[in-house]
From Swiss-Prot:
InterPro entries xref list: GCIP-like, GCIP-like_N
Parts of the chain that traverse the membrane: none
Lineage of the species this protein comes from: Eukaryota, Fungi, Dikarya, Ascomycota, Taphrinomycotina
Modified residues (Phosphoserine): 211
Stretches for region Disordered: 196-222
Protein name, as recorded: Uncharacterized protein C22E12.18
Pfam families xrefs: GCIP_N
Tagged with keyword Phosphoprotein: yes
Keyword tRNA processing: no
Keyword annotations from UniProtKB, A to Z: Phosphoprotein
């Protein structure tokens, strides 16, 4: 072996050693995510606590980008080690952010979202370290084998952006975005139900078709709906319309920064349950499932609970009577 090869081999070994040191920090931090004690926010951030999230995510994004660029030929040991070590300095602030924004003080939405994004960031950093290393790195965990290896730098940077957005817009910004998704899914459910009522069975059982032509041929004939089925579909459409009005009203009147995070979290969870129950009930009617009545009861109950939260868990205002009236009408509609 020539002197040059020996020198290159030694340099690669030093790079691997340095990257393994950083990787150990990352893997250890990721294991801590599921069992962390809350800590207080640094005094200098009390006035704008969410800015901590934005600052941490921005730094991680910057350093991981620099490391990714440094790994392109010609690769130098100094550049790799410098940016890997710089990146390592962001791990502690990231974990601290998860500890600061705990569920007890800031609500489950921020805590759960932040933990999810932080885990993806850490997996992404691990993936980046492994990709730039000249030799395989250690610390291969079961989590890495099953989930981490599927994370790439694109997901890493997307997660950084999600944390930045959470830091910029807070829980309200996140909820408004998700709320639009709820309404969109509700619209899709209404559309599917209209198709069902008209006798169109396509679009919800085509995944196994060998070709588009096969699919069209299989569903070329409309399915006859009985009067009872049509009445049931119309009744459910009426309820979905009522739920859409409720969702839009909540978005306008209840998803505001003036409400505590605990209330907003309770509201979000109830909305998600209602949205999920809508998907379930429409799927049940399409498949003519015998469990339809149970799913229908669950749908009625989840929508009722969502409205009750708007009445009882928020400070009474001029719009509280509207929610009370909606609930009153829902009790009538849900009996049909």
């Amino acid at each position: 072996m020539s002197d040059t090869m020996v020198k290159n081999q030694a340099e690669e070994d030093e790079i691997v050693k340095s990257l393994n040191n950083v990787l150990k920090i990352v893997v250890t931090a990721r294991k801590c995510l599921d069992d962390m004690k809350p800590i207080e926010l640094p005094s200098e951030l009390v006035e704008s606590p969410l800015s901590m999230l934005k600052d941490v995510a921005t730094l991680i994004h910057q350093y991981t980008t620099k490391l990714s660029v440094a790994a392109k030929p010609p690769i130098t040991r100094d550049a790799l080690e410098k940016y890997a070590n710089d990146m390592a300095t962001t791990i502690t602030p990231l974990i601290a952010a998860v500890q600061v924004f705990n569920a007890e003080k800031y609500g489950e939405i921020i805590q759960n979202r932040l933990k999810m994004y932080a885990e993806r960031v850490l997996f992404g950093i691990e993936a980046l370290l492994r990709s730039v290393s000249p030799k395989p790195l250690g610390y291969i965990s079961e989590d890495w084998k099953t989930r981490g290896r599927l994370i790439d730098t694109g997901i890493l940077w997307e997660s950084c952006e999600k944390i930045e957005k959470l830091g910029s817009e807070g829980i309200v910004g996140y909820m408004l975005e998700e709320w639009d998704n709820f309404v969109s899914m509700l619209e899709d459910a209404r559309s599917d139900l209209e198709d069902y009522k008209e006798g169109d069975d396509s679009n919800w059982d085509d995944f196994g078709s060998e070709s588009e032509d096969d699919s069209k041929e299989a569903h070329s004939e409309e399915v006859f709906r009985s009067e009872e089925q049509i009445q049931l579909a119309n009744s459910l459409l009426q309820k979905l319309n009522a739920c859409k009005i409720l969702f839009l009203s909540i978005k306008k009147r209840r998803i505001k920064n003036e409400y505590p995070n605990t209330f907003l979290g309770e509201l979000f969870n109830a909305a998600k349950q209602t949205s999920d129950s809508i998907d379930d009930i429409v799927a049940q009617i399409q498949e003519d499932d015998e469990n339809f009545e149970n799913e229908l009861d669950n749908f009625h109950r989840s929508a009722r609970n969502l409205c009750k939260i708007c009445i009882s868990s928020a400070q009474e205002d001029s719009f509280t009577p509207w929610f009370s009236k909606w609930l009153e009408n829902w009790e009538i509609v849900s009996q049909k």
